[in-house]
Amino acid sequence: METRATLRGVRLSVDKGRLVADLIRGKKVDQALNILNFTQKKAAGIIKKVVESAIANAEHNDGADIDELKVKTIYVEQGATLKRFSARAKGRGNSISKPTCHVYVVVGN
């Protein structure tokens, strides 16, 4: 039995999100949450919320036992990039790109 949770449009770089996602892929959910608690990255807090949501979905919608759940798949995909403009000297300008990403988590037995 598989249950999923999704978070889309997160203001986070894809590479930084994947760095944290690789730490918990295939682990039991209690071990994954423990790893995320002690990882000092911005992405860890974001991914922790998605994992907790997937656990709650599994418990509420499917009646799954939390102790047996594992993080089956977790992946971070690139989202839309917010493009901003920064004024510079002598009438010039620089572009600022603010990347977003989508986080997908699937938990199951």
UniProtKB/Swiss-Prot annotation:
Keywords: Ribonucleoprotein, Ribosomal protein, RNA-binding, rRNA-binding. GO terms for cellular component: cytosolic large ribosomal subunit. The keyword Metal-binding does not apply. PROSITE patterns: RIBOSOMAL_L22. Transmembrane segments: none annotated. Pfam families: Ribosomal_L22. One of its GO terms (molecular function) is structural constituent of ribosome. Signal peptide: none annotated. Belongs to the universal ribosomal protein uL22 family. This protein binds specifically to 23S rRNA; its binding is stimulated by other ribosomal proteins, e.g. L4, L17, and L20. It is important during the early stages of 50S assembly. It makes multiple contacts with different domains of the 23S rRNA in the assembled 50S subunit and ribosome. The globular domain of the protein is located near the polypeptide exit tunnel on the outside of the subunit, while an extended beta-hairpin is found that lines the wall of the exit tunnel in the center of the 70S ribosome. This is Large ribosomal subunit protein uL22. It comes from Polaromonas sp. (strain JS666 / ATCC BAA-500). The gene is rplV.
